[in-house]
């Protein structure tokens, strides 16, 4: 809560609201999306920026592996829950935080929950590939004149990411942060995608340092993007929309 109190002190007079949810639970994602849609008259920008790295494989109450649930399904469910509000707010923008860690990752659609083979880094890399494929399919389904969807690699940023990963993973992440960039620098591409007129009609792209970049071949697979969307909708119990 300290960062929120700091925001309130430095942004006096600017209306803002805070909504809380457990990002590992599908029901919570649906609830908070419905709550935001009900109370916010318009949404100009949606930034999906949740993420985690877990040392051990555990399932959520929905039967989803935690990395997949937090890093991908949370994005999917919240975005779908806010789709109508975003369309009504046109022009609007959706920004998904991905990562260069997707490079070299592949998806096994017969094992999205990593039951056959789990590794903390492997699961994380897969989830970041999901972010890019989700963005790609989302952009295909949205009218660029109404809502754009892009994703980005922010760089390795010195935040609290990974602090609660558990076991040896937490120690490795903490040590690596000595070489990380500042949160302000890590936010630059997000701010650019959220506000720059240069990308007002750009959609379905992957960015790094405010420049459109080429993701891995696996991240450019339109069939995989469609299949991931269909599987995600089924897992979340969300009707297929065009």
Per-region residue spans from a language model:
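C-terminal helical subdomain
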Residues: 127, 151, 173-215, 220-226, ...
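Extended hydrophobic/aromatic segments used for targeting, binding, or gating
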Residues: 2-3, 20, 29, 169-172, ...
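A short glycine/small-residue-enriched secondary-structure motif
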Residues: 9-13, 168, 207-209
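A glycine/serine/threonine-rich, flexible loop-to-helix segment
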Residues: 158-174
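Rossmann-fold NAD(P)H-dependent dehydrogenase/reductase core
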Residues: 1-160, 235-242
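Short alpha-helical scaffold segments that flank and stabilize functional sites
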Residues: 3-6, 36, 134, 138, ...
């Amino acid at each position: 809560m300290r960062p929120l109190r700091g925001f309130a002190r430095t942004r006096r007079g600017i209306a803002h609201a805070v909504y809380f949810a457990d990002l590992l639970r599908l029901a919570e994602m649906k609830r908070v999306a419905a709550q935001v849609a009900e109370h916010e008259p318009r949404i100009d920008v949606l930034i999906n920026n949740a993420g985690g790295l877990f040392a051990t494989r555990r399932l959520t109450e929905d039967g989803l592996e935690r990395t997949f649930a937090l890093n991908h399904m949370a994005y999917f469910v919240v975005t779908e829950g806010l789709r109508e509000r975003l369309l009504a707010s046109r022009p609007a923008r959706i920004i998904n935080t991905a990562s260069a860690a997707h490079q070299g990752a592949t998806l096994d659609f017969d094992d999205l929950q990593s039951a056959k083979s789990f590794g903390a880094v492997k699961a994380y890399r897969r989830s970041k590939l999901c972010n890019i494929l989700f963005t790609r399919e989302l952009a295909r389904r949205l009218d660029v004149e109404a809502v754009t969807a892009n994703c980005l690699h922010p760089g390795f940023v010195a935040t609290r990411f990974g602090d609660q990963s558990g076991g040896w993973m937490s120690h490795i992440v903490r040590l690596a942060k000595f070489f990380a960039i500042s949160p302000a620098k890590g936010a630059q591409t997000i701010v650019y995608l959220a506000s720059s007129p240069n990308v007002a009609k750009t959609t379905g792209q992957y960015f790094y340092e405010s420049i459109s970049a080429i993701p891995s071949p696996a991240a450019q697979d339109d069939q995989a993007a469609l299949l991931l969307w269909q599987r995600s909708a089924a897992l979340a119990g969300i009707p297929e929309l065009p």
